Amino acid sequence: MKITIFGGGAWGQALAFAFAQKNEVQIVSRRNISTALMPLNEILNKNSHRIILQSSLEESLNSELFVIAISVQALREWFIRARLNQNSKILIASKGIEEKTGIFVSQIAKKFISLENLCFLAGPSFAKEIILGLPCALAIHSCNPILAQKFANQMPSFIKPYIEDDIIGGEVASAYKNVIAIAGGICDGLNLGQNAKASLLSRGLVEMCKFGEYFGAKMQTFLGLSGAGDLFLTANSLLSRNYRVGLGLAQNNRLEDILRDLGEVAEGIKTSQAITQISEKEGIYTPIATEIQKIIQGKSPLESMSTLMKK
């Protein structure tokens, strides 16, 4: 089967490697893949002969399945530019909330593609470990279980896919955990200890559950791979960009410098802004997301953590 991956970042390349174990894959990206993320490219070149690097969007639209792994903030523009057929079968691997509108990924995508033709990937997964072929489990959220199973069947043996029907829950969990991961990095960067961090992460999980339930998500989704699983991974590892943003903020580094050093998007930054706007509008209590947004805007990380521990 032929699969097109849109997005040449670490996540897009990792998914290309994974799907290429069973399929012919092409990556479409506006970035120069040959010079970006060289360690990943070396592994791709050594382990797969089925990956084609493609720069032309038009020439990439002849695949049976499509995977989108670009920044959520660029997703709307991408759909407008791509002009995909309404019947295109798409797996969206982007995680976040659109900052300027405060809407979820599915709400953006269904303006261009029928929800029946959309699936959403979630769960604990670092690009580096996927490219190394290390085992992991992921969730595919969709209202169309047949399509979700079709994507699941294309995954390699080292990935165990689970089919879920809670689209909103998967989206909220995938987006919100990035914000809590920034908080986890700040907690570690300030050397507040494991007791404080355990309190922060457990309260963060409750916070994202309540936020998701407000929009109709299922509680069980947040206790599974898409919620707790992804949160525990992302908030505890240097492989996590959002966690490293938190570390940098705790050390009083400028956000611009932190992002430059990362070289990749950290979705939790924009997502914290979107969540804060939504919670203020809807009256949802989101203290951790609110404090993270204040830190991004210049508030002392230590003062914010102190505020949270007193609530």
Swiss-Prot record:
Q: Which UniProt keywords apply?
A: Cytoplasm, Lipid biosynthesis, Lipid metabolism, NAD, NADP, Nucleotide-binding, Oxidoreductase, Phospholipid biosynthesis, Phospholipid metabolism
Subcellular localization(s) per the UniProt record: Cytoplasm
Q: Which InterPro entries match?
A: 6-PGluconate_DH-like_C_sf, 6PGD_dom2, G3P_DH_NAD-dep, G3P_DH_NAD-dep_C, G3P_DH_NAD-dep_N, NAD(P)-bd_dom_sf
Recorded E.C. number(s)? 1.1.1.94
Q: What does this protein do?
A: Catalyzes the reduction of the glycolytic intermediate dihydroxyacetone phosphate (DHAP) to sn-glycerol 3-phosphate (G3P), the key precursor for phospholipid synthesis.
Which family does the record claim for this protein?
Belongs to the NAD-dependent glycerol-3-phosphate dehydrogenase family.
In Swiss-Prot or TrEMBL terms, this protein is called: Glycerol-3-phosphate dehydrogenase [NAD(P)+]
**Species, as recorded:** Bartonella bacilliformis (strain ATCC 35685 / KC583 / Herrer 020/F12,63)
Q: What is the lineage of its organism?
A: Bacteria, Pseudomonadati, Pseudomonadota, Alphaproteobacteria, Hyphomicrobiales
